[in-house]
A protein has these predicted regions:
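Hydrophobic alpha-helical
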Residues: 1-24, 46, 144-145, 166, ...
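Sec-exported extracytoplasmic/periplasmic mature domains
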Residues: 3, 7, 27, 31, ...
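Short, solvent-exposed loop/turn elements at domain surfaces
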Residues: 23-24, 98-104, 133-139
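Short helices/loops that flank or line small-molecule/ion binding pockets
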Residues: 24-29, 167-178, 197
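Short beta-strand elements at the ligand-binding edges of bilobed clamshell
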Residues: 27-39, 43
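Short, Asp-centered acidic motifs that coordinate Mg2+ and/or phosphate
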Residues: 32, 180-181
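Hinge/cleft segment of the Venus flytrap/periplasmic-binding protein
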Residues: 44, 48-123
Length: 201
């Protein structure tokens, strides 16, 4: 995609998900790219756990501000009530805004305030990423999680899978009682029982 014809004709560098090389190419005259708002994805992942652990309204720090002032605007996320799912919304990265995306591991400004440990004490979380070799997950998503876990007072054990077998992950869930919460990223979406059977022990 990075060729002279694309550059001369302003063709967006789709498929690169606002990775560093795609954003840098915009400065060289390429048309742009798309960001799936990994910073918001990572925040939502851990924020939902934090809210559940604190026993507060699920939208705290999302649709409504928390005590530290963290809040998301409706143009960066969407909640599907039927699916009970939160989604980060894609955003176009262009010559006008690409400088905002030069660091793909920077927490999203409106939700980058430290929580008070007296009201949100440290909790232990087990979180797996189904494929540690995936460039987006390992180079963007996990580094963002690692920054947010500090802000949200969460002590997270990150487990990287091989992207092929569920057992590569489940074999490292030996002592569930050591954790207060779990975030599970399955290799195959029909393998939930492999995890719930371990958590029920």
């Amino acid at each position: 995609m990075f060729n002279s014809w694309s550059q001369e004709n302003g063709v967006p560098t789709f498929g690169y998900d606002a990775n560093t090389d795609a954003v840098a190419a915009i400065a060289d005259g390429y048309g742009g790219t798309i960001s799936q708002h990994a910073d918001v994805q990572a925040y939502l992942t851990l924020r939902l756990l934090r809210n559940a652990l604190d026993g507060v309204d699920i939208n705290t720090g999302i649709a409504t501000p928390d005590a530290a002032g963290n809040v998301l605007s409706s143009d960066v996320y969407y909640y599907n009530e039927d699916e009970r799912s939160y989604y980060a919304l894609n955003v176009a990265v262009t010559a006008d805004n690409y400088t905002d995306f030069t660091d793909s591991t920077k927490p999203y400004g409106p939700v980058s305030n430290q929580l008070d440990a007296t009201t949100s004490p440290e909790k232990s979380v087990w979180l797996n990423i189904y494929n540690a070799a995936d460039n987006f997950l390992s180079a963007t998503y996990q580094p963002l999680l690692e920054k947010y876990d500090d802000l949200l007072n969460l002590k997270v054990d990150y487990i990287g899978g091989d992207g092929q077998t569920e057992s590569n992950i489940t074999n490292r869930l030996g002592n569930p009682s050591e954790y207060d919460a779990f975030a599970i990223n399955m290799v195959k979406t029909d393998n939930a029982a492999a995890y719930t059977s371990l958590l029920s022990k």
